[in-house]
Amino acid sequence: MYTTPAPPEITRRSSEPSTQQGTLGSLEGEKGHLLFPGFVVLVTIFLVVIVTCILWSRKKQKKRRVPYLQVTPSLALPPPRQRAKNIYDFLPRQQTELGRHQLSGFSTESLLSRASDSPEPEVPQASGSLQKHRASVHAVEYTVGVYDNGTVAQMCGPLASSAHRVCDGTSRNNSISSKESNDYVNIPTAEDTSETLTCTKSTPESHLGLPSGQRLEFAEGGHAGCGKATDRTGVWAPGLQGSNSLSEGDDSSQSSNDYVNMTGLDLEDIQESRPRVAFQCCRDYENVPPVVANGSQLQTVEEVTSSTTDRGEPAQRTLPSVYHMAFRPSAWSEDGAMIPGEEASNGDSSDYENVLVPELEGKDWKQGPGTWHPSDERTPSDQAGKFCEAVYPAGSLATETSGEEV
């Protein structure tokens, strides 16, 4: 059969919608391919950010934990032991003290409790030593005190009226003393007690060490002013120039000026070489101004025995204590008077001060073993190395005689 061809306008209209459908499908496919990779990229970026944040936070936490290490207690360690109970705390006080001495082991609590409950053992020992010293002092019967120059005037009274005195024997023995102390009392040893008691009964004179070279002369009862010059009670403290009777060492003081040790002192040699001069016992050594000696101002203390008088025995009464001064005459005039202005000083002692020697014209002087009188035939040069003595009344020196002078 024979067909007829279609016109060209109809063929063009039918082909246009098919091409339009093909383009729309291709466009949708391309859009789907483009959205998937973009979404994947966004997800990966987000994950990376999250991971970096986590790592940064962990680093900060690690840095903070390094200086502060936290020690976690382990549960495997055993629990601490309980302290042992002190069974003696429940006992009475006496049983507690007895039980604590029997402990083989100790703890800090027991040591603290012992220290608080234990009494101090030093107190009874100190009291016992004081009682021993008191007992020894009362056995010898002399008072213990501190030597002081200001109390010398107060000491003169009780020394003059004392019935028990320390004799010459105790001064020759060693004394218990301290070489570096300025205030102390010489206490004789136990071996000297028997000799001290016997000497006080047998000998009429006794010697006591007084500070800084003082010498006290005092009379007691009816013995005052009677007898020879050697029967007087007196004390001579060394310290004058040229004294060799003391030995170097323990017999003398090396660093003190308030006392004089009488150990190793031979008083007889000192009395023979150095006569004594009496002064009123009031203060320490002072300057004595020159006195114009006359009958009322200068009085001699004469000791006259029974063989020097025919009418009666004269008796004298002096004050209980006087000063003693020894000086050396330096120059004499032809008529028997000492040249004024001469001074006698002591080179070895720092406690003495220079004393002016008074005039001797027509005055009575107490002659000692080494004195020189104007009536003597010897010259003053023979007596240059010896001492002379004089009596100076201080205040009122009462001298009474019960008989007429020859």
From Swiss-Prot:
Residues 242-258 have a biased composition (Low complexity). Residues 1-33 are extracellular. Pfam families: LAX (PF15681). Residues 55-406 are cytoplasmic. One of its GO terms (biological process) is antigen receptor-mediated signaling pathway. The chain crosses the membrane at residues 34-54. It is found in: Cell membrane. Keywords: Adaptive immunity, Cell membrane, Immunity, Membrane, Phosphoprotein, Signal-anchor, Transmembrane, Transmembrane helix. It is a single-pass type III membrane protein. Phosphorylated on tyrosines upon TCR or BCR activation; which leads to the recruitment of GRB2, PIK3R1 and GRAP2. The modification Phosphotyrosine is found at residues 184, 259, 285, 352. It comes from the Eukaryota. One of its GO terms (cellular component) is plasma membrane. Residues 1-25, 109-131, 219-258, 358-406 are annotated as: Disordered. InterPro entries: LAX. Negatively regulates TCR (T-cell antigen receptor)-mediated signaling in T-cells and BCR (B-cell antigen receptor)-mediated signaling in B-cells. When phosphorylated, interacts with GRB2, PIK3R1 and GRAP2. This is Lymphocyte transmembrane adapter 1.
